[in-house]
Regions:
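Active-site regions of enzymes building and remodeling cell-envelope glycoconjugates
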Residues: 44-69, 80, 101-104
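Short, charged, surface-exposed secondary-structure boundary motifs
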Residues: 47-49, 61-62, 112-120, 262
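Aromatic-acidic/polar surface patches that form glycan- and anion
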Residues: 9-20, 60-62, 134-138, 145, ...
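A glycosyltransferase accessory/donor-loop signature
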Residues: 135-136, 151-291
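GT-A fold catalytic core of metal-dependent nucleotide-sugar glycosyltransferases
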Residues: 66-119
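Short, flexible, basic/aromatic active-site loop/helix in glycosyltransferases
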Residues: 122-135
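N-terminal anchoring/stem segment of glycosyltransferases
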Residues: 1-58, 76, 267-291
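Short glycine- and hydrophobic/aromatic-rich loop-to-beta-strand nucleating segment
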Residues: 143-151
Length: 291
């Protein structure tokens, strides 16, 4: 059986509001075999011991921390999954776990071709990784990253380090790649690189599932769609906004939607979520986390 770890980055000052302990409960409810790791305050304070480049004056370390939080795990696990701390696990991660692809990603842009209620994310696809454009349906979100290949994490670190060191703290100076500015951009380039890794976007159109911010849409608010989540056969679903197809929804990702100021007003992000979703879905989550 595949040995799997989930990692999230959450320092103590954020943990009281984002509640990674509840994320752990939800993941272990569906997958007791998965080990959950929080890269917390102590690890963050010591990160430059192993990654001195993250402490450079010209590097905004929060744009490049993801690999550093996962690398301590890659030698001990067959699969490592990164989940942002503002994710909610509502169901099985089976599509991820069962994938044999070396890299597993989730879409950034929704069924209307937008990033929530905002404009879509796309990127030029720079050589030597590719050419042309990483388009609306292919651009992936770095809030949920999984890999069955440990070498990927080292390559991603090296790519991040190279790009970060080209910055003066404000502007990126490496002219061949002017639009690669953070780890989401580097993730997209490695994921889609030609003749490199096998890759799978698990929530593509027609997959019947959602695993991230693809399930966000609305006229004014990114997550108006979450009000339409419902329970069926003990699982959380959201209907496709165009075709009406029921989509099994395993992960919600706030992705900055609930600002920390708003979350603090609710006490934590789970109370914020409960105030937005239906009572039956809220009760489902509460039964898992013990609220």
């Amino acid at each position: 059986m595949k040995k799997i770890a989930v990692s999230t980055w959450c320092t103590d000052d954020y943990a009281v509001y984002l509640r990674p302990d509840r994320l752990e409960k939800c993941i272990n409810h569906f997958h007791p075999e998965i080990d959950f790791h929080v890269f917390g305050t102590e690890e963050t304070e010591n990160v430059t011991k192993d990654h001195p480049w993250l402490g450079a004056d010209n590097v905004k370390f929060s744009d490049w921390m993801m690999v550093a939080t996962c690398l301590p795990l890659v030698e001990d696990y067959d699969m490592v999954i990164h989940m942002d701390a503002d994710c909610f696990c509502l169901g099985s991660l089976d599509r991820v776990i069962e994938s044999d692809a070396e890299l597993i990603g989730v879409r950034n842009n929704n069924f209307f071709g937008k990033a929530g209620s905002a404009q879509p994310c796309t990127s030029p696809f720079y050589e030597p990784y590719g050419s042309g454009q990483i388009g609306v349906n292919d651009f992936i979100n770095a809030g949920f990253v999984a890999s069955n290949d440990k070498q990927f994490w080292y390559e991603w670190r090296d790519f991040n380090k190279f790009v970060a060191e080209q910055s003066d703290g404000r502007v990126f100076n490496y002219q061949p790649w002017p639009m690669i500015r953070n780890e989401q951009d580097t993730w997209n380039h490695i994921f889609h690189a030609e003749n490199k890794y096998t890759s799978e976007i698990i929530d593509q159109e027609g997959s019947g599932v959602t695993y991230g911010i693809i399930n966000q849409w609305g006229d004014k608010d990114h997550c108006e769609s979450w009000k339409k989540l419902y329970m069926k056969d003990g699982m959380v679903y959201l209907d496709h906004p165009i075709t009406g197809e029921p989509l099994r929804t395993s992960v919600l990702h706030a992705a900055g939607v609930g600002t920390m100021e708003t979350i603090k007003d609710y006490g934590d992000q789970y109370n914020w979520l409960y105030g937005m979703i239906s009572e039956e879905v809220a009760d489902h989550i509460k039964s898992i986390v013990g609220d």
